């Protein structure tokens, strides 16, 4: 390869760190010819939050490329990249259709009553169908004995975090039999970096617990005694780096558990790697999130 004399042709490193709607770490581009005969560069970049942490991982961007000379040059490759870019002429926008992921602001509701799962739901280290079944009443999870920190298949059903700001809610019908039983939700970067927010048991009572795991070491942030034998709604809300976990047993009156916590352990800056965090449904019979 012969380096281009105009290098770099795609970079954000020279731009002010505090610029609004920042897109950063641009690179790893593929050059393609579009249906309009114009060249484009499809590349990876990230959208950091207000703490400059990356919880959504690498994402795909596109810019037009001028290849009229000897070397390709990205049009706008040294300018602040915008989170939303124009579609190439002749390309049909099928965002959110026919197996393509949705983009931008949207809501997604899953009842789990269909015969098959939406393609957006993913498992870890094993087929998702190994521990779930869909019924007329919703999803049933038959929990594995493995804990979420195990490097083994776990009974977790995930949806990738796509937004810096989001709310995810689920309603749970569950009665733990022992302190080793837990079911709820998780925000997950890896087996070593995650939050678990779920229902478990202490003595004869049911509790909602919030557990934080960093570098494989877990601690219970907070817990609250709750009514047993009652459906419970669990919710996680993120505003950039700030995450809150809450629950409701009636009338959508949500109570926060553990206050506002940092999403630092869900970022690639802290946990490593390049993929974003996931929000998931989780159940286990090897729980170690103890009620306080």
Predicted regions and their residues:
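Carbohydrate-active catalytic/glycan-binding domains of CAZyme proteins
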Residues: 1-292
């Amino acid at each position: 390869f012969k380096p281009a004399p105009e290098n770099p042709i795609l970079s954000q490193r020279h731009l002010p760190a505090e610029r609004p709607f920042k897109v950063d770490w641009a690179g790893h581009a593929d050059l393609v010819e579009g249906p309009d005969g114009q060249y484009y560069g499809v590349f990876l970049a990230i959208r950091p939050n207000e703490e400059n942490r990356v919880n959504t991982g690498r994402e795909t961007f596109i810019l037009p490329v001028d290849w009229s000379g000897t070397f390709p040059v990205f049009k706008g490759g040294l300018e602040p990249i915008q989170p939303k870019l124009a579609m190439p002429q002749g390309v049909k926008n099928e965002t959110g259709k026919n197996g393509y992921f949705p983009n931008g602001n949207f809501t997604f509701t899953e009842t789990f009553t269909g015969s098959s799962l939406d393609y957006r739901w993913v498992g870890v280290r094993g087929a998702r169908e190994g521990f779930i079944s869909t019924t007329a009443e919703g999803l049933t999870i038959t929990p594995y004995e493995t804990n979420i920190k195990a490097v083994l298949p776990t009974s977790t059903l995930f949806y990738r975090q796509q937004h810096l700001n989001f709310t995810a809610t689920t309603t749970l019908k569950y009665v733990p039999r022992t302190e080793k039983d837990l079911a709820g939700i998780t925000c997950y970067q890896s087996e070593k970096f995650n939050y678990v927010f779920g229902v478990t048991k202490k003595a004869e009572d049911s509790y909602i617990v919030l557990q934080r795991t960093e570098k494989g070491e877990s601690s219970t942030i907070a817990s609250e005694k709750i009514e047993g034998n009652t459906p419970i709604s669990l919710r996680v809300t993120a505003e950039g780096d700030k995450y809150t976990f809450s629950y409701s047993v009636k009338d959508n009156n949500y109570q926060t558990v553990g206050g506002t916590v940092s999403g630092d352990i869900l970022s690639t800056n802290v946990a490593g790697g390049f993929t974003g965090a996931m929000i998931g449904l989780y159940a286990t019979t090897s729980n170690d999130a103890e009620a306080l």
